[in-house]
Amino acid sequence: MGYFQMTRNVEEIFGGVVVAPHQIPFKYTSTNGGETFLSLPFYPITGFVTINSGVQVPIDNFEIDGNTLNLGRELEPGDVVFCLFDKIMSPQDASNNAVRIYKFLSVGGETEFTPDFTAYGVQSLYIDGKYKTPGEDYNYFKTSGKVVLDTALPTGVWVVAEMSIKQNIPALAGNNGASEIGTNSGKSLAESLGTWIDTTIAIFEMTEAPSVIQTRGFYETNDGGAGVWVATGIISPSLAGTHVPSQAKVYNAGGVEYQLNVKSGFEISAKANGVKAVDDVNAETEDFVCLGEAINGITSRVKTMVNDEDLKTYLKVIIPSEYPLRIGKTSIKAYSRLKLDFQQASIYDRPSPSNRQEVTGVYMNAIERGIEDVRAISARFGGATSYSNMTLSDFHIEGGKFYGDHTTDKGVADCSTGTGLFTYNMENSSIRNTWFQGFACGRQYNRTGPGYYFDNLGNKVVGTLVPEVTSSGTGSYEGVKEWSVTAYGCRYLYLRVLSNWARFDNCKFGTYANWSSSPDGNQCEYFIENRGAGVVFSGGVIEANTAAANPTKGFVRDYARGCTFEGVYYENCLSAGWVIAIPEKSQYNRANGLFLTAIGSQFTLSSQGAPLVKFEEGYFGSYNPATGLYKTGGWETNYQYAGGVNTWAVGQPELDSGAFPHGGYDFKYGTYGIHYSGSVPDADSLRDTQEGNEFLSPYGLSVNSGILLFPTLSPAYQSNIVVWYKDLTGNFDPRNIVVGDFDNNNVSDGTSNALYRTNGFNYYDYGNGYKAAIVPYVNPRALDNRMTTSAGRKLKITVTSDAPIILKSIQAFVGGTPIFPPAIKDYVPRSQRDRIWGTMSAGSTDSGAYYGPLVGGGIFRPGDVVLPFVPFGNAALMNPASYTDNSSGFGASAETAVITGGATWGAGLAGATFTLTVESQDTINNWTTVSVPSAYLPYIFTGMPVYITANSSGGSTGLINTVRRVVNSDGTLSNKYVLYGALGAAGTTLTVSTTSSYTVRSGVSSTLTGVSGSFSASSWLGTASGDLRVGFGASGSGTRQTRYYYNGADVSAVVGSSGANALHLTGTGGITLNGSLLTSTSYSFGSASAYPANIYSQNAVTVVSDVHYKMDIVELNDAEIECAKACAKLYRRYKLKTAVAIKGEDGARYHVGTIAQLVMQAFTDAGLDWTKYGIITYESWEASDAVVETVGAVYDEEGNELVPETIMVVTPAKEAGEIYMVRYDEFNSFVMAGQEARLQALEEK
């Protein structure tokens, strides 16, 4: 016969055909011949094959390949193939090598057995060749690995168990065994295999009705649709010869009903329920197999859409990679613990004519646990579901491309599809490698909450979805995960997320579609709406492939509940990137904030760009100057404490503290530190005003017009300069913010003009007029043009009157930027204090040529401390000799001062005189509105008083505070200001002068405060004479003095004054003069009431006796000689009363001298007037109290007293009195003249 055949037949080998307990027979009789292979209904491992009883040699005569038996020759008609197979497996078991045989011969009485290898379940059990039913004849216990029998074994029977040795990989027949196909316990294996036919559709013509039918395919043999169909016992003649996919049922020619055998643990192909490709996805017909019906028919065999039950079962449905498949009669339903593997299938959601939305009123989703499903669950439990029942858990999708029917040439009424994937309360579920295109919405992961719900088109419907959520939500909604999922060309939305801690990796959201060109003109407002907390988007793309495809409001609408977007690229971003939604009162925030990092973006055209982050209008509040009230925003109205870390940031920002002087500009001191170009800007300081405190900071600089230059220091390369401002009209173009605006010739070819020039572009929009612009700093050489006359090192902001702004903060950051500006660290300004604009030259209102890093100027308030300032220029960067003191042109100050009041304009603004006209009075607030001539708008500043020198109505003059500037209805700034006080009726003219200055106090005191104890500018250094003044400007009289503490605690010396003409020096250990004590002839050393006790001198007193200093020089006359002779007899011995009081009567010593009254009498006796001579002096005084000073106690850091409080007598008390004194040098000279006259008279005798 052309092939080798053994001479021994099977009967000779076995002594007759005997089937061993663990062997499975297979017999095939050829009808027409010609077969070279046979398809088996199972997957054998080994086997014994005969043809016409002749044994076939493996490899030579046959091979087993899966479920195919390849023969060594063609069969001839009538040939009989008989096989005995040792073991069979399901397709999955075959591919996973998941089954192992355990067998033994019973000894009798056994009620249990344990295999000698690790197993995870029993697939089938045969005792004495008969199949046993799990749960009835035996039970398997996973923890012990034992198989427990209901009936003890007889002696000498074979027990054969097919054990699962692969965990969680069920066999064809599931957990209960590969051969349990609806048989009764005790049937032989051969009986349990049922009837085999080639195709399922062949059942339609069958007249016989076996209990079990196994098919090798659905439409054709081996087409992948093999299945086991079990008779249900129902006969429906009207359905004879039909297939009902939604129930996975078929009917034979007599109407006998069969249902597809599906059990928990199965991995089954959707082809088993008749899934097949359609010829035309748009065909107006009902005659097609709906993929939704076919899958639902399979899943409904084990799934109920009630989580309590579904979590006990598992099912995987494999959808063929065929093109195209159609969903048109019902959506694919989502169940817990269900996996749908769509592989590479292309699936079109195209409702049939009877299922279009104009007929049903419902837009069909592709995959759903939808609105009606949730309502059905609620109805099943009488409106009292559990948290678990309302949850869709462990639902997974793999692969597939889904296409809806929305295109730009159709309006929504002409379409019938809703959302690609629509779920409520989904948790711990995933979707991977899936594509959605042409739907109203790509995916919606919703939750059942109170107040509203979302429909299939993504519309928000106000109302209650089910009774359970009238007051609070129910069902879980967290842990959704996506990998490489794409949504493309969707009409309204690509993704809505109400799932907490969801994650989306490498997902794509985008379109070429210009939906505005559709009949409805309904362009997407957003691509993504995220309401979940802790949601992460990583490594994806959000793109509008054309400018026309941009969403109308923003790419992402986010509730900022601690969500992260990292490594995301968004393209053609002409709309806002992330729009922050106003919180809802019913929303419980688990965290508060938004974190964006490594965001890539691309602009089309040379536009000002759209903001990266935008807050919905009304999110933040605003101040209404007309009412003087603050209107709260939605965030303030609906805010609930986050209970988590706030993460408002883009990237991981760190302050570039060296980018600007003081780390940035906060406008606390108005114009401080700001240069300008051209004419003086029209600006206002909003410090400590309601307008300034409206948002982001308590300060602000309102700019109506001008070119402002902000000096930089050394910004880091690629530093992000952020300018926060309020756009009063909405017309400000952030491209008017520029850095690096100069010709850079520090390159080798010298040709690169403005190489590092960058413009600002929209960055943040807070929805209440406040915005932020970002200006990248791209110059790697931060010293370029430092301190030269170029504006290259400055941030330049150009403002025009049709687009005024309020500057709030300017800072630079590396590594990212915060969404809200941090406060600048407290600093002390350095300024001249004599001009508003530090760069203004003295003779012109045009800006000067000083371009140093510090420029001074500013608008100050009482209490502000201002440090010294000296401006320097540097014409040549590398030449220190080129540094020039520019004080003559730009002013300077040399001491620290505290502003106490006043105002100053300074430099080119000083000395101007103009008039204001009263427009109206507000008697309630005591305000007066005035108009200002346009030319003098730069001379009036909110935040600084107006100096009124004349009032035509006779009203108030002097420094009058400004309240605010009037804003026009279109947001532009008017020429009207509101001043404090009732200054006159409408039409009153007020004459204004800019000649004024600040009042200040200067100096340093660490322990004293207040006027009487602190230094002030006028007392420290007098401006006229340069005096050191102590006590100048004090409100009353008193002792003024300086004290010296030699050891830090004890007073050793005091210098002071206690009267109009009194200076006292007090030294506890003496007063040392290292120099001559000089005075004029007009002053004395001591006085009648304050005289020294002793004078110690190395030399005698030297008296001026120069003839040029004297007049009326004559010799003594006779009367004077006689008086002198008499005075010689007036020397006496005496004790001083002061010495007796101190030393006592015995201790006091005698002194020799004269007595003033005796000398006076001698002059009188001689007929002379003693008052005409300087020998006797007389003084008298009024009584006075003692002058004392209290020296405070000294304490250590812990409050312990180190030195007690002491009271020091500066000047002792004095009683009223008088005193006569003698000048001994003159008295002795007078006496000597008398003695000489007596000696001469004696000699002449």
From Swiss-Prot:
Q: Which UniProt keywords apply?
A: Degradation of host capsule during virus entry, Degradation of host cell envelope components during virus entry, Host-virus interaction, Hydrolase, Protease, Viral attachment to host adhesion receptor, Viral attachment to host cell, Viral tail fiber protein, Viral tail protein, Virion, Virus entry into host cell
Residues flagged as site, Cleavage: S1105, D1106
Q: Which InterPro entries match?
A: S74_ICA, WH-like_DNA-bd_sf
The molecular function terms in GO held by this entry are: peptidase activity
Any Pfam family from its record, for instance, is Peptidase_S74
Superkingdom assignment: Viruses
CDD domains referenced in this protein's UniProt entry, alphabetically: Peptidase_S74_CIMCD
Per the record, its GO cellular-component terms are: virus tail, fiber
Q: Where is the Peptidase S74 domain?
A: 1105-1245
- Gene Ontology biological process terms from the UniProt entry: adhesion receptor-mediated virion attachment to host cell; proteolysis; symbiont entry into host cell via disruption of host cell envelope; symbiont entry into host cell via disruption of host cell glycocalyx
Entry protein name: Probable tail spike protein
